[in-house]
Amino acid sequence: MSDPVFIVPKAGLTLGAVAEACGVPLPEGADPSQPVTGAAPLETAGPSDLAYMDNARYGDALGTTRALACLVSPRFAPRVPAGTIALVTRDPYRAYAGLLARLYEEAMRPGSLFAASGVSPGAHVHPQARLEDGVRVDPGAVVGPGAEIGSGTVLGPNAVIGPNVRIGRDCSIGSGATLTHALVGNRVIIHPGARIGQDGFGFAMGAGGHIKVPQVGRVIIQDDVEIGANTTIDRGASRDTVVGEGTKIDNLVQIAHNVVIGRHCVIVSGVGISGSTTLEDYVVLGGQVGVVGHLRIGMGSQIAGSSNVNRDVPPGSRWGGTPAKPVRTWFREMTTLARLAERGGKDDGEG
């Protein structure tokens, strides 16, 4: 549940404003001036809270909720209790997310941990760095020579911005994150401990030893990207590593040199993408997916968690398994193996 000690909800949001934002009419008799002071799960929501429901497994909780209002899809609307106002929308979760953004504005983007305004004592900004008005720098952060940082951007404690790095406006760079050899767009969120722009893993291997290949490319991060804690993105070897507009990357992801990730991709925790692979727009990689190098995963494809991708994936595909293959083939193989294993166990007197 939300705790006002950490995140304070915005005052002044009313039931009428909620309905207007969702594009749904209020039921007859509902008071549009009623304040909405929080958001909570169905089970714990109180008489001034907003809740949502879009999964049948929570039907019992819906029937007993005490929420002021609940965002529901049309098929669940009849199950909303009499004391709760049903706000009927085709996509309750998306509507709920939008309303949370209005109610908890400060949770949308990490701010200064020390309520800094300008450069804090204890931070070090090189005289040749260029910071626009409105940049906030927490204690311990370091900004190298030639770096450029746009207005509204926040650097957390002990963040390191290397020489000549460019960061756009309204970004958030988490505590302990490091950025080198990188160009970062606007409204980018980089969470604590992320490592951006370090050497890619490149060696010319041979019997006499392994010769390091200089990594002379960059990392390009476009607008509205979010990068999770302790994720690592290596700079390119001779071309750039690119993360496309609107892409969301979870914690603990490794992206190797020369990887190109398209627009609005989703990459879940534990993924590893080997060098020179391309993800086209709107690709989704489930948790702990491994992708071999020099591949192309087509637009809109989805890869199931813990899969290993070792060949190109056509656009619009749904693949899974090790090695990854179309999900119908994967399921059929798993079912066949399960039946064979069961039959074998019975034949051996184990069934």
Curated annotation (Swiss-Prot):
Active site: H257 (proton acceptor)
Reported function: Catalyzes the N-acylation of UDP-3-O-acylglucosamine using 3-hydroxyacyl-ACP as the acyl donor. Is involved in the biosynthesis of lipid A, a phosphorylated glycolipid that anchors the lipopolysaccharide to the outer membrane of the cell.
Transmembrane segments: none
EC number: 2.3.1.191
Family: Belongs to the transferase hexapeptide repeat family. LpxD subfamily.
One Gene Ontology term of the molecular function aspect: N-acyltransferase activity
Cellular component annotations (GO), alphabetically ordered: membrane
Subunit structure: Homotrimer.
UniProt-recorded name of the protein: UDP-3-O-acylglucosamine N-acyltransferase
Keywords: Acyltransferase, Lipid A biosynthesis, Lipid biosynthesis, Lipid metabolism, Repeat, Transferase
Catalysed reactions, as listed in the record: a UDP-3-O-[(3R)-3-hydroxyacyl]-alpha-D-glucosamine + a (3R)-hydroxyacyl-[ACP] = a UDP-2-N,3-O-bis[(3R)-3-hydroxyacyl]-alpha-D-glucosamine + holo-[ACP] + H(+)
InterPro entries xrefs: Hexapep, Hexapep_transf_CS, LpxD, Trimer_LpxA-like_sf, UDP_GlcNAc_AcTrfase_non-rep
GO terms classed as biological process: lipid A biosynthetic process
Pathway entry: Bacterial outer membrane biogenesis; LPS lipid A biosynthesis
